[in-house]
Amino acid sequence: MDSAISSPEIFIALVVAAHAAILALRLSVSLYRA
């Protein structure tokens, strides 16, 4: 099963997506509490 993108790129994309999701959650929580 070979894909166009390699495994390290998938891992980096997951880390970036998780970081963005955490930042969005923290922002929404701070806006909700304000």
Curated annotation (Swiss-Prot):
Pfam families: PsaM (PF07465). Keywords: Membrane, Photosynthesis, Photosystem I, Thylakoid, Transmembrane, Transmembrane helix. It comes from the Bacteria. It is a single-pass membrane protein. Belongs to the PsaM family. InterPro entries: PSI_PsaM, PSI_PsaM_sf. It is found in: Cellular thylakoid membrane. This is Photosystem I reaction center subunit XII. NCBIfam families: PS_I_psaM. The chain crosses the membrane at residues 5-25. One of its GO terms (cellular component) is photosystem I. One of its GO terms (biological process) is photosynthesis.
